[in-house]
Structure formats: C-alpha cells, structure tokens
Amino acid sequence: MATVPDLSSLSLYKVKTNSICSLASQIERRREVLKRQKEKRDEQFSQLRFLESEPEVIEEKKPQWPPRRHRRAHPHPPCPIEMMLAEWLFSVPEDLSSWFVIPCPRGQRCLVVVHSHRTHIYGKHGNLLRTMHTNLPKQTILYCIYDHRSSIYHILDMIMWNGQDYSTQIECQCRFFMLMSLAGDSRLTKSFQILSRTTVEEETWTNEAEDGYLFYHPLGFYETGYSPLVCWLKPFMIEDILQIHCSYPIVKPLGYTTAHDYMFNEQSNRKKEIFNKSKEEGEFVSMDQE
C-alpha cells in the first residue's frame, strides 16, 4: 500500500508564474474547480426541492447530437462533445490517496461515438478518424485509448451509455462505478476493454504502465478541456513526484534531471511539437504529447 506524502514534506521548486504547471496555480485552480462544482450540485439539489412544490423543466447542457432532419445531409456527423484533458501532476494534493489512478497503455486518445447504426471515432480536435460497425448501444460515448498494434480500444471513461448521460454533474467515482459494472457486458466485445483502476492508496506500483498514469479526483465532473482534477505522470516520475518506491525498473530519458524540469521543458516545447507533428491518424501518440 502506497503512502502519499504531505505537501509540506515536498521541496518547493522555483516555478514560472505564467506556466500552467505552476505549483500555486494548480493548487488554487483545483480548489476553484471543486468549489464551482459543489455550487452546481447545491444548485441542482435546490432546483429539485423546488420541483416538489412547482413543476419546472431543468435544462442541462448535454452532448449535442445532430438533428434528425440533417443527419442524411451529414454522412459524418460532428463530434457531440470534446475531450477532458489531463494536466501534469505538478502539485501533489493532500488527498491524493483517495484519487483514482489508471495505468495507461501507449496509444491514441479518441472518443467512440455511437449514432443510430454506425460508430464514429473522433480524435482530440473533433476530427473523424474512422467509421465502423460495433455492438455498442446507440447514443453511447466512450473516452478511449486506441492501440493500433492490437486494434483494441481501452476505455478510460464513460460519457454516455445507451442514452444515459454521464457528462452532466456526475462525479468521477459514480461514472467509474457504472463503467466497471459493464464488465462482462456482451456488447463490449474483445475490441473494447475497460482499463483497470484503483485508488492511489491501494495501488502497489509493481507493474510499470507502458505510457503513464492518469489520476482522477473522485468528485470531479466530466468537463471539456484541461482540468486540474485529472492529472498525468510518466512512469519515471512517480518516485520523484510522489516519493513512493516503485518495484518496476525506472528508466529515465537521456538528460533527465527532475520531473518538474521535464514538465517545464515539455510545456515550453508543446507548441513547436504540435506545429511540427503530422496528423494524428495512423500514429502512436503519447498522452502527454497530444
């Protein structure tokens, strides 16, 4: 069982104040997001109590499916929702032991969207990657990592399943519970496999993740764009950032000094990498490089 250090036990690195990886910035943004999401939950509860005395329709922002009258005119409908993207785990939260951790294989992040009869695969920027037939129920959206070598879609998160929306004010721990309950469902063929997950406290760190580790705050909603409630570390950063001993061999990149320096270098080079990188389709893309 892993022991997560307190923030006070970590040495504070000099950081760039304008960087998304700023220690103070990530801590504060994490608090602000949790506060805002709590306010949303409280508001929803208040509205539900109000409905007991006076009916009222509550409109929520849900994935936008193309109107039926336009579907024939658009053989490849646009992606109904955007991805939720991870930040580097630059600052270690005091409650990290309760966060979920998912070891991730190497592959390409994508959204699997099932319309009425066909399944569309979309990339990070909403670009259509491919179309195929699956056994998945219609009106289903899964956040996956596609492994080109095995042709397997590894499921990270569930945004919608069979018309049931999980993208609106549904906590991560609830989404993951519902997702794991689908294990063994006949509609999930061998091409779709749910990635294992556990809490940081229960993680043993005996097997190295091929690409890295995703960390999810248990109370976080699914929100598009970068979120401080979803964070990312490469395997060689775990001991440096979490101060946890890993049983797997640590292989660090050439010239590696510290995890924070590596993050800063990746952050400063991101625009250049995106500009020079060819289109995602048909490539292996590391999750921290997209």
What kind of region is each of these model predictions?
Residues 2-63, 80-122, 184-290:
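Nucleic-acid 5′ end/cap handling module spanning
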Residues 62-185:
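Covalent nucleotidyltransferase core used to form phosphodiester bonds in nucleic acids
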